[in-house]
């Protein structure tokens, strides 16, 4: 039976239907017969996985590399960890009375139920909530990194189901680049942070100075959104061998700075003062007459207004190197030298994203673009700026060949009527707690007044919001408000332990999929082959939502799957890539042959793409290749933002002091840096054996400057309590001179493990502030926080972050 979208809604709403729980696909014959090493992939690259007696025993990278990637050793941990969710579970109080549970989330025991019971309960309560409140009451934004693959995309599969059900509230933006991706379209006409960069071969050939501003590629290039092609680290290795001078601007002496060693000059400003430092450099360029007036006149708009601010004409405060030195802690002479070095050489300004994950984060990348414009090197080989060299191997030239399409949340012929009638909405992703606290509340976002939905149901699939969201204790309180929360997940994360219904999902090693390597290069197609059978009662998201679609109305499963099972979808995606490759005269084997060969496919080099210069066409002809801004030029002053009238995001790059920084700290407060960890992908793998490489006394480490440690009586290896008005955490001390005095670093991503108000595992977001970057982007500001530290002298509480929750027999 084939139903149109209108017939589907008309005949069913969300009426109950017969449920037949389909099992996960059987283990393919090739895995049983061949055993040994199986080719697959993850965010951290293509891997060979060794299987013995139905268990993964080891995993190694499948691509040659100079710099090892520790994350590629974790496949066995991912599948066989004791933190796995083994069975469908329902919170006892919720199971007893879904309409009025006796206990709050996070305080209850769980009850094991069958898959049929779990899906029936979800369906009934989803139906009730949707009918009573409409689609906007269902939040299925479900942000998170999930797993690699073009089919088994947890959030997409959830949203595909919710579209069939009649729509949902989603999210806009992300936690990684929330501020930059909203401001950059006003400045350069694109989100910029996810764009291909000037090619690495041109950097190595033409750049004379490379500035790494707030980025640590030796950590962040271990991963990619699809799967890393591993070329970014190879290019940084070549940059090191070239001997070119590298300027690293970062409050902490990162792994990347250590890697470059004598090639790198480390400059450590006070946290959050990057705009002031850039302004000091810009003022020096201007006063020395080293700014490129011709470039500014031809390719930008609004520089005269900005120069009035720079000189102090508009506010009586010249943004000189002396002024910048007082704010940043960087000596005046060094600021002047930086300006002179950048102006005298072909300079590439590479910037990371941590600098914009701060209050007023929009200003950081805007000011860096302005600085690059003053240097006049944008659009030249090896000059200008780039915001993705640290992410997914930006700058690795795009290959020629096939590109895999991906599963869509939309279903052919079945567009959501809710979207058509305005019944769907999206909130800025980092404002989820604001939305829960203020249903129906008004807020400003990117020039428009918007309204928070009244969220009654949340489904989180493949994401750890209790780890990536700021101010965990505030989140926990807001999390009590919805009527139902479902988490479908592989592991007992803190989010899962605060859900009403928890569904066990397969890891990528327990199912079949495909992925590209290189989000910019599209260098390889990799078969993500199932290595072992689904563990315990784990099922694929695809099968779970297909069964729920059948409960919407008989025939719903057929609509959801479009009549294709796992392998049929993979063949469909592969065939589309093969067709695209053929159009470019690149040969790919037929799907069945490709799948049996257990080999990846590498796409063809492109000499043209190896010569790619970001903004090269714009520089060559700014009229023909105008940018997507109102003026068609780089907007140093934005008339659009002037009309918005936001005091927290003025019309040109501006130094705005955050609420919590060195300038507002008392004598005992330190600034908190929440950097990306070396041996995790955010919160992923926190349970893995790699933990032994970094944990101190089985806690998340805290990096403390030697003088600060001495001041507070802390020695290397001590347990340290870190706290502020938002919460407290327990960490292990790493004492070093390799961090700015007055700054401490706790890497983001540790799983929250709260007991009597203390996070025993050291989750940084227990301490960070849940405030918006500004009214423009409403992005997260996790790097704007002050904390206190002290040596912990009590008995160390037992870590329980990775334990199973209490289950009623």
Swiss-Prot record:
Q: Could you confirm whether the keyword Membrane appears in this record?
A: no
Which terms does the record give in the GO molecular function aspect? Answer: electron transfer activity; molybdenum ion binding; molybdopterin cofactor binding; trimethylamine-N-oxide reductase (cytochrome c) activity
Annotated organism of origin:
Escherichia coli (strain K12)
What name is this protein filed under?
A: Trimethylamine-N-oxide reductase 2
Q: What else is known?
A: Expression of torYZ allows E.coli to grow anaerobically on a wider range of substrates than does expression of torCAD.
Any one Pfam family here would be Molybdopterin
- Enumerate the cofactors the protein uses: Mo-bis(molybdopterin guanine dinucleotide)
Can you tell me which family this protein belongs to?
A: Belongs to the prokaryotic molybdopterin-containing oxidoreductase family.
Record key words, sorted: Metal-binding, Molybdenum, Oxidoreductase, Periplasm, Signal
Q: Which reaction does it catalyse?
A: trimethylamine + 2 Fe(III)-[cytochrome c] + H2O = trimethylamine N-oxide + 2 Fe(II)-[cytochrome c] + 3 H(+)
Q: What phylogenetic lineage does the species belong to?
A: Bacteria, Pseudomonadati, Pseudomonadota, Gammaproteobacteria, Enterobacterales
Bound cofactor: record note = Binds 1 molybdenum-bis(molybdopterin guanine dinucleotide) (Mo-bis-MGD) cofactor per subunit.
Q: Give the domain of life.
A: Bacteria
Q: Pull one GO CC term from this UniProt entry.
A: outer membrane-bounded periplasmic space
InterPro entries xrefs: Asp_de-COase-like_dom_sf (IPR009010), BisC (IPR006658), CT_DMSOR/BSOR/TMAOR (IPR041954), Molybdopterin_N (IPR041460), MoPterin_dinucl-bd_dom (IPR006657), Mopterin_OxRdtase (IPR006656), Mopterin_OxRdtase_prok_CS (IPR006655), Prok_Mopterin_Oxidored (IPR050612)
A GO BP entry is: anaerobic respiration
Which sites bind Mo-bis(molybdopterin guanine dinucleotide)?
A: 176
Modification(s) after translation: Exported by the Tat system. The position of the signal peptide cleavage has been experimentally proven. Can also be exported by the Sec system.
Name the job this protein performs. Answer: Reduces trimethylamine-N-oxide (TMAO) into trimethylamine; an anaerobic reaction coupled to energy-yielding reactions. Can also reduce other N- and S-oxide compounds such as 4-methylmorpholine-N-oxide and biotin sulfoxide (BSO), but with a lower catalytic efficiency.
Enzyme Commission number, as recorded: 1.7.2.3
